C-alpha cells in the first residue's frame, strides 16, 4: 500500500475533522444501528449466570460450569462458553469500593460453601486480579501512587495464591491458565516463566484462543514487548500444528488493532493472513455480525477494496456500533470501498 493511499485511508476512517457534504449526511441518516444475534445470546447467558451469582445460588452454578467444562461449547462467533461464564461475574472498574467489597464477600461465600470447587477459586482469582487493577488505575506507571502500587501487589499475590490452591484440586479448567497469565503479567513474571506457563496452557487446550490474545497483548510495546514482538508471536501461533491457523492470527489482530491508527501501516501485521483468517471465520460462524463488521473495517484498513466492497454490500445500511464507534467511520469506509474516493 502506498504512503499516499495509507494517509488517505487514515483520513477516511478515523473520524478526523472533515467537510461533510449532503451526500454523507444523508448516508449517515439512513444507517441502522443493529444488534448481533450471537452477542445477544451471549448477553442473555451472562445475565442468567449473573443472577445466580448475585443471589448466591452456587448450587445451581456448579453443575452449569461442570457441563461446560466437559462439553466445551462455543457460541456462534467462536467465543468459548466457559470464558463467557467467568465474564458474567465481572465487576466494572468504575464501581465504587463498596461494590468491590460486596463482590469479595460473594466470592468468599462461594468458596466456603464449595471448598473443592475449581469454578469458585478461578472466579475469585479473576476477581482479585481485576480488583488489583482497580487499585492501580489505568494511568501510566509513573503516575500510579505508592499506595496504589502496594495494594496492586497485595491483591495480585492473593490471586496467585488462590490459583495455587485451585491447582491442588483434581478438576482442571481452561480459564485457570488465562487468569494465571493475567496475574503473571501484572507481577512481571520473567519471560521464561511466562512462556512456560503459556506452553502448559496450550498443551492443556490448544484451541483456547484466549491464551494467545493474552500473550500477544503482553507483547505490546506499552507492556513488555518491543516493536514487532506481538506480530512475530501471531505468526508463531498461526503456525502451531494443533492450533487455529489463520484464524488465531486474525483474532490477535482483531484484539489489538485499536491501539493503532492503522495496524497494517504502523506494525508488521500481515493483511493477507488476516484476510485468510477472517474468511475462515465467516465460513465457520456465518451468524456473527461482529465478524462481518470487523471484516469490513479491517479490509478497509488493509486497502482491500474487493473484499471491503463485497462485505459492505452484505451489510447494507446496518452497522454494529460496538465495532465502528461513530457512524461516519462506517460511511466513509463504505464510500471508499464502493468508489475508491472520499
Residue ranges, per PLM feature:
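C-terminal motif of bacterial Sec signal peptides marking the signal peptidase cleavage site
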Residues: 17-18
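Extended alpha-helical scaffolding segments
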Residues: 281-325
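N-terminal mature-domain "stem" immediately C-terminal to a signal peptide or N-terminal signal-anchor/transmembrane
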Residues: 21-76
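N-terminal secretory signal peptides that target proteins for export/translocation
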Residues: 1-2
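Short coil/linker segments at helix-helix boundaries
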Residues: 59-116, 123-244, 248-276, 310-341
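Sec-dependent N-terminal signal peptides
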Residues: 5-13
